[in-house]
Swiss-Prot record:
HAMAP family: MurC. Pfam families: Mur_ligase, Mur_ligase_C, Mur_ligase_M. Keywords: ATP-binding, Cell cycle, Cell division, Cell shape, Cell wall biogenesis/degradation, Cytoplasm, Ligase, Nucleotide-binding, Peptidoglycan synthesis. Pathway: Cell wall biogenesis; peptidoglycan biosynthesis. Belongs to the MurCDEF family. The keyword ATP-binding applies. It catalyses: UDP-N-acetyl-alpha-D-muramate + L-alanine + ATP = UDP-N-acetyl-alpha-D-muramoyl-L-alanine + ADP + phosphate + H(+). GO terms for molecular function: ATP binding; UDP-N-acetylmuramate-L-alanine ligase activity. The gene is murC. Cell wall formation. ATP binds at G114, T115, H116, G117, K118, T119, T120. This is UDP-N-acetylmuramate--L-alanine ligase. GO terms for biological process: cell division; cell wall organization; peptidoglycan biosynthetic process; regulation of cell shape.
């Protein structure tokens, strides 16, 4: 593997999941790697064992004789002394995604994009490859217990990447196979208009080489429109719309699904998926399509999908009690994701009372989608809306925007039991009253609601609400 005359790479924020994987790949490819991070730990220790020089803290002299400096989205270049020093010395400074795109040129790059389903589909493909005896390099924006983390640096020819559309990062990647899982309004703080978002997805899909393939879900109207803009070979998949790869005879069962895959005129019955929800069947169809494209035998694809055990924060079972009490944690933070997650709970556990606990993420998203969130939540038996998790936004910039907007929208959508509770301790007290037999308490959101889910699961275990274990 060569990057011109570049031999010495310095990585700012080298301890992050995505950055450490790039560092490991560079080290195993013969590059000299240095880096810095504010934290230390096992990841840093491992990189040092592989030969990296890593400093704790940022200093201008760390840049040294580097040929290029790479930084992550978590680093602010305008205030980082190492990046400023590199720029003064005329050393190229690039984002993580640009380096990743260059490294992908030496692999068969499988990039999974979409408004929803990226993390799960990427993990399904990775599991499928590993179960088939392959040794892929994998980078996922979530934590997989099967993969023992979010990254794998393999020796094989495939590189499986979660391609994030935020800030147009995925346009720096160089996919051989581009998966477009879903497409609807999201990240308008980056794109401004839907036309700009559509243009970026079209540009991403058309980045595949003439011998590559685009794999797209035609159940999404925006993707059906996108197909007319493709100038590359493509495979379609879906459940509702006619497609090259489809699911039929779909049966939802507690904790998963069983279905038949119809692909290019062939039928593959008895496909079992150990994660619930129709949306996960679509994710599995994307992975199945990728498997066929890279030449995996169908029986190995099916076995790989059956081995998929889920991701942390993707319908993650945190507590399972002997009396039927379940506590689930999910990353859903867009109306479509919330709707799909509530639906998965409703279909998978038909006899359970479904209690949805939702923390809105970002003031801007809450303001834009309050009505849609209300409708998405309304199929739950009881709804609790927590305070908004601001992330990168400031409260004072969004006067009057609170979780009550979502709660009121849910009431207008017909929900009977709706509570807005911004106080975490009060919310926990209320949920303790909900923790009865055959009840599924579903925590959703991209913010710190996950910590509340963990606390509540521990409370259920400690208080002996039912015989079971917190996960």
């Amino acid at each position: 593997m060569e990057l011109g005359r570049t031999r010495n790479v310095h990585i700012v924020g080298i301890g992050g999941a995505g950055m450490s994987a790039i560092a490991e790949l560079l080290l195993k490819s013969g590059f000299s790697v240095s880096g810095s991070d504010l934290a230390s730990g096992e990841v840093i220790d491992k990189l040092r064992e592989l030969g990296a020089v890593v400093w704790q803290g940022h200093e201008a002299e760390h840049v040294g004789m580097s040929d290029v400096v790479v930084y992550s989205s978590a680093v602010r270049p305008e205030s980082n002394v190492e990046i400023q020093a590199a720029e003064k010395q005329g050393i190229p400074v690039i984002k993580r995604d640009e380096m990743l795109g260059e490294l992908m040129r030496y692999k068969v790059g499988i990039c999974v994009s979409g408004t929803h389903g990226k993390t799960t589909t990427t993990a399904m493909i990775a599991t499928m490859l590993l179960e088939s005896g392959q040794s892929p390099t994998v980078m996922i924006g979530g934590v997989s217990d099967y993969l023992k983390g979010s990254t794998v640096v393999g020796e094989g020819r495939h590189m499986v990447i979660e391609a994030d559309e935020y800030d147009r990062a995925f346009l720096k990647l160089t996919p051989t196979i581009a998966v477009v899982n879903s497409l609807e309004s999201e990240h308008m703080d980056t794109y401004g208009t839907m036309d700009n978002l559509r243009d970026s997805f079209a540009a991403f899909a058309n980045k595949v080489p003439f011998y590559g393939r685009v794999i797209c879900c035609v159940d999404w109207p925006e993707i059906r429109s996108l197909i007319s803009r493709l100038n590359r070979r493509y495979t379609t998949f879906g459940i509702e719309e006619p497609a090259d790869v489809m699911a039929s005879d779909l049966e939802a069962c507690e904790g998963g699904s069983v279905f038949t895959v119809e692909a290019f005129g062939e039928s593959y019955p008895g496909v079992r998926l150990g994660v619930p929800g129709r949306h996960n069947v679509l994710n599995a169809l994307a992975a199945f399509s990728v498997g066929l494209e890279i030449g995996l035998p169908p029986e190995k694809i099916i076995a790989g999908l059956g081995a998929y055990t889920g991701m942390r924060r993707r319908f993650q079972m945190k507590f399972k009690g002997g009396n039927g009490l379940l506590v689930v944690d999910d990353y859903a933070h867009h109306p479509s994701e919330v709707k799909a997650t509530v639906k998965a709970a409703r279909h998978g556990w038909k006899e359970h009372r479904i209690v949805a606990v939702f923390q809105p993420h970002l003031y801007s998203r809450t303001s834009e989608f309050a009505v849609e969130f209300g409708w998405a939540l309304s199929r739950a038996d009881a709804i609790y809306v927590a305070g908004i998790y601001p992330s990168r936004e400031r409260t004072e910039d969004f006067p009057g925007v609170t979780g009550e907007l979502v709660a009121e929208a849910a009431r207008k959508a017909g929900a009977k039991e709706v509570t807005f509770e911004p106080d975490s301790e009060q919310l926990l007290d209320s949920l303790r009253q909900e923790a009865g037999p055959d009840t599924l308490i579903l925590f959703m959101g991209a913010g710190d609601i996950t910590h509340l889910a963990t606390r509540f699961a521990s409370m259920c275990a400690d208080e002996g609400t039912a015989t079971g274990a917190a996960g």
